[in-house]
Amino acid sequence: MSTQLRTLAVAVALAAAGRGALAQSATPAEFWSALGDTTLVRLVNETRLTNRDIRIALARASAARATRTSAALDLLPVVSTRAGYTRQRIASASLPGVSGAFPDQNVWDAGLALSWEVDVSGRLRQSLRARGAQAEAAAEDVRDVEVSLTSQVASVYLSLRGAQERLAVARRNSENQRRTLEITQRRLEAGRGTQLDTERAKSQLSATLAAIPTLEAAIESGRQRLRVLTGRSRLDELAIPPCETAVELPDAPALGALEQIVRDRPDVRSAERQLDASTAFVGAARAEYLPKLSFGGAAGYTGSEARALGNTGTPRYVIGPVISWPAFDLGHVRANVSAARADEAQSRARYELSVSQAQEELETSIVTYGKSRERLRYLEDAAAASARAAELARLRYTEGGSDFFQVLDAERTLLERENERAVGRTEAETNLIAVYRALGGANVFRSAAR
């Protein structure tokens, strides 16, 4: 009995540890704070608390822990109460040597019943091990859902910010182009310009303004997606104030130091725990080849009247061991063992695949992120040079030192370069989130200026 109680105590402790692990995983990661965007941190925290997918994963983890506790309780004796009433007639023919008719009888019964399977074969312990591994896998699934959803929230948010930046670029360039149009109109009125220059300026301004509705729609779509991910029912509750600073882009981590981190990813750890559970289920299935030893018993009172129950003349009890063995059903046992081994083979393949895919995702995301940071530096230089060139072209045209084609070309190039810079920054930021996702939420970045 003491062995079974110790096993139950271990199961309860594991359940408490699982709840602690979930609570710890729900705290905001330093990674998000290091990015320097308070709105992003707020959205990530709200997602952890209110997202429905996370709530579903938490409910599954709770169910898995309850199943583990139930498996632990199977190791202990089961005591139940019973009370009942029957009316019976006994035929005299069923009692040899007795003649005559027996009158109908009332039988009142109340007492306790005991049943206990002694885990001689280890079947119950293997089942407990399997359920424990499944509970741990469910806890890792919660972490995986959290990492996946918070990464998705961050990617949507950063794409929204990118659309906002491109919208600002379009509006800023449209204002510059509107001033250029006014210059061409004044020159035309003064007899120093041409109608062709004015129409070209109008065409370029209209093309720039045409991009604004599309960007506004992209921003609204991003807000709607964030509303769903954060679990909000109303869009007006989702406040996204203007962001004055860009997200910090840290240096990419070194690949050589990340092999263990890959195996600590929640999806990989979940696959590993599922493999352990499948192995334990094989052991439980094989244990069915061995006999089962159980103890059963009952104690209570029986009488012809309810008020007689409890009197010294009405007690009864029964107790004894029972040994059972499926001697004529071993084919069924063999089939169950084969099925369990097939499940174990699937779980092993899933685990190996998860490790391989995790390594691929991590290596690809780190290389992509590093190259996107490098590309962003060039795009920023190109945008700055284009801004200077556009300003010089407008100045030379105003002073009569160049034709209008140079102004159009410089302004068109400026719009393209600033758009490319905004897109490049969004790509670098979302690639950073992809690295975080590939790391399974681990924060191994070193803060650095771009």
Show which residues each predicted segment covers:
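Bacterial Sec-pathway N-terminal export signals of envelope proteins
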Residues: 22-67, 246-276, 326-327, 352-355, ...
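Amphipathic alpha-helical coiled-coil scaffold segments and their short linker/junction regions
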Residues: 48, 130, 193, 197-207, ...
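Periplasmic alpha-helical coiled-coil/stalk elements that build and connect Gram-negative outer-membrane
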Residues: 124, 140-257, 368, 372, ...
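Small/polar, glycine/serine/threonine/aspartate-rich low-complexity segments that form flexible
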Residues: 26-35, 82-113, 236-254, 283, ...
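Sec/SRP-type N-terminal targeting helices
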Residues: 55-56, 72-73, 118-146, 196, ...
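N-terminal signal peptide c-region/cleavage motif recognized by signal peptidases
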Residues: 18-20
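Bacterial N-terminal signal peptides that target proteins for export
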Residues: 1-9
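Acidic, low-complexity, intrinsically disordered peripheral segments
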Residues: 234, 249, 399, 420-450
